[in-house]
From Swiss-Prot:
Disulfide bonds: C32-C75, C61-C91
Function noted in UniProt: May play a role in breast tumorigenesis by promoting estrogen-dependent cell proliferation, cell-cell interactions and migration.
Record GO cellular component, one term: plasma membrane
Organism name: Homo sapiens (Human)
Stretches in topological domain Extracellular: 1-103
Compositional bias ranges of the Basic and acidic residues kind: 179-191
Sushi domain segment(s): 30-93
Name of the protein described by the UniProt record: Sushi domain-containing protein 3
Entry-listed glycosylation sites: N27
Induction conditions: Up-regulated upon treatment with estradiol in MCF-7 cells.
Segments in the Cytoplasmic topological domain: 125-255
Region (Disordered): 1-25, 173-255
Length: 255
């Protein structure tokens, strides 16, 4: 009986030692139970060996699936037992009608961003065009002002020249001019000789009376001579000439 009791005691001791799976928290060498991997899910060990205390696991679900539960698990002490922070997550399939709204929202956001970008570009383009038009207007205004100044200066110059010419051509009242037309004077002997030759030709012409011939003018070499060219459109003054006689230049000698 004593032997049987000792045998039972020896068998009971190893059983009790083998039954202790988790050591005391002071050892910090416990392990967490293995997790069951959910269907269509993957996990990644971020820290630890996958079961020891301090291990961190991250779960992921494929596309068109939604994770139910926490995707980040940590092996920690809870009293004297090492356990995971939460249960393993589950990947749930998302129906198509639920993803349709998400897709529509994404497309709408993209379209709105494109519209905003286009409007901003159009605004910038309009601003640039306005700046270019303003610069062109300024240049045209400057050129117009310059041309107007040049025209005013030219007009003043022309008016001054016209007024000076008009004053120069204005007839002077006096006994030396008989008609309002162009005349020239000279006091050289050469002009006197030319006038004498003209007088001889006039004297030789039988159709011209002697009253028009020059007398004594060729003898003075310093005599001032003025020749008047009568206007052919105006009739000559009646000084002894017949109406049927041809009009010829009249020569006068001023002593």
């Amino acid at each position: 009986m004593r032997w049987a009791a000792a045998t039972l005691r020896g068998k009971a001791r190893p059983r009790g030692r083998a039954g202790v799976t988790t050591p005391a928290p002071g050892n910090r060498t416990g392990t967490c139970a293995k997790l069951r991997l959910p269907p269509q899910a993957t996990f990644q060990v971020l820290r630890g060996n996958g079961a020891s205390v301090g291990t961190v696991l991250m779960f992921r679900c494929p596309s068109n699936h939604q994770m139910v539960g926490s995707g980040l698990l940590t092996c920690t002490w809870k009293g004297s037992i090492a356990e995971w922070s939460s249960g393993s997550p589950v990947c749930k399939l998302v129906p198509p009608h639920e993803t349709f709204g998400f897709k529509v929202a994404v497309i709408a956001s993209i379209v709105s961003c494109a519209i905003i970008l286009l409007m901003s570009m159009a605004f910038l383009t309009c601003c640039l065009l306005k700046c270019v038009k303003k610069s062109k207007r300024r240049r045209s205004n400057r050129s117009a002002q310059l041309w107007s100044q040049l025209k005013d200066e030219d007009l003043e110059t022309v008016q001054a020249a016209y007024l000076g010419l008009k004053h120069f051509n204005k007839p002077v009242s006096g006994p030396s001019q008989a008609h309002d037309n162009h005349s020239f004077t000279t006091d050289h002997g050469e002009s006197t000789s030319k006038l004498a030759s003209v007088t001889r030709s006039v004297d030789k012409d039988p159709g011209i009376p002697r009253a028009l011939s020059l007398s004594g003018s060729s003898s003075s070499p310093q005599a001032q001579v003025m020749v008047h060219m009568a206007n052919p459109r105006q009739p000559l003054p009646a000084s002894g000439l017949a109406t049927g006689m041809p009009q010829q230049p009249a020569a006068y000698a001023l002593g």
